């Protein structure tokens, strides 16, 4: 039931970028040791097997601790998660709160709220999993989450171009990843029929045979996010929290189906984004690695 691992020899590569967003700098040389990475993100079916065997409950399925939210109304301290909602028209893209809602009852089984389900989506990436949930699955699987350096090394697929497939986002008009097609955040024409997550492996693999490294869902890494790359940071990491710390943000990689050129041009290996450890959303998933 676990995802097939693809063995990578490791090596040195140039990590980061100075062409897009300041947090991707500086470009620097990083060496990663041999490791193996899952060919695709963890799916709903795979996460379901973990839950069935262990009885695990995700953070989104547990009511928030009142001690962490002093002054919050009891009615607000119920299980739930962040859900993307398309707007009715153009909005100020500087305010993400216009398209994200906290929905009671949203969790990995019901990604968009209590009335939604994952029926017929067993091969879609699992979402509504926070960092702690991803770490728990990885430990159950006898694996771990990748560091940011390991993830970027794998995502590049041996290439040095902007995207794993070249320097054009859609060469010859061909869509290479599940990203937002249309005008964000109010009109999504769908990528090859997908408006939201897509089944893993719909889009072409990179040079290492890995799929969905770019687009579909952002992926958790073990690297704590800083405003710029921290030179000398460990290229590998193997630990994670027993409980999420909302004051700590992890580095997300890969972009998602919500990334669009005019808003989030982060569907590239070098791109990175912060997310607090306790946050689950409709556009974040993960994949695991194993030591080589």
PLM features per residue range, with description:
Residues 43:
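Acidic-aromatic/histidine active-site loop/patch
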Residues 22-27, 94-96, 271-277:
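Short, P/G- and charge-enriched loop/turn segments at secondary-structure junctions
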Residues 1-7:
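GGW-centered surface loops in extracellular recognition modules
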Residues 7-8, 14, 18-19, 63-269, ...:
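Functional-site microenvironments in short loops/helix caps that host divalent-cation chemistry
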Residues 38:
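An anion-binding catalytic pocket shared by soluble metabolic enzymes
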Residues 282-292:
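Short, structured beta-strand segments at or near domain termini in extracellular proteins/domains
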Residues 29-35:
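A short N-terminal beta-strand-loop micro-motif at the entrance of redox/enzyme domains
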Residues 35, 50-59, 141:
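Short capping motifs at secondary-structure boundaries
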């Amino acid at each position: 039931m676990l995802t097939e691992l693809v063995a990578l020899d490791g090596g040195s590569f140039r990590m980061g970028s100075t062409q897009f967003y300041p947090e991707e700098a500086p470009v620097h040389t990083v060496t990663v040791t041999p490791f193996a990475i899952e060919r695709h993100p963890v799916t709903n079916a795979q996460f379901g097997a973990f839950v069935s065997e262990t009885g695990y409950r995700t953070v989104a399925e547990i009511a928030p601790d009142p001690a962490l939210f002093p002054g919050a109304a009891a009615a607000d301290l119920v299980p739930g998660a962040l859900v993307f909602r398309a707007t009715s028209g153009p909005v100020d893209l500087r305010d993400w709160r216009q398209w994200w809602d906290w929905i009671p009852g949203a969790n990995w089984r019901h990604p968009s709220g209590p009335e939604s389900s994952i029926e017929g989506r067993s091969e879609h990436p699992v979402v509504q999993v926070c960092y702690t949930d991803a770490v728990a699955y990885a430990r159950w699987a006898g694996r771990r989450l990748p560091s940011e350096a390991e993830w970027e090394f794998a995502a590049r697929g041996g290439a040095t171009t902007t995207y794993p497939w070249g320097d054009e986002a859609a060469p010859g008009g061909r869509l290479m990843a599940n990203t937002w097609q249309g005008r964000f955040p109010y009109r999504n024409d769908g990528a090859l029929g997908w408006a939201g997550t897509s089944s893993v492996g719909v889009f072409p693999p990179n040079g290492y045979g890995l799929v969905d490294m770019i687009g579909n869902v952002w992926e958790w890494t073990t690297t704590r996010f800083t405003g710029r790359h921290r030179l000398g940071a460990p290229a590998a990491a193997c630990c994670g929290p027993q409980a999420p710390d909302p004051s700590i943000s992890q580095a997300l990689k890969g972009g998602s189906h919500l990334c669009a050129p005019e808003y989030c041009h982060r569907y590239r290996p070098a791109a990175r984004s912060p997310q607090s450890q306790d946050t689950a959303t409709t556009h974040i998933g993960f994949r695991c690695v194993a030591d080589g």
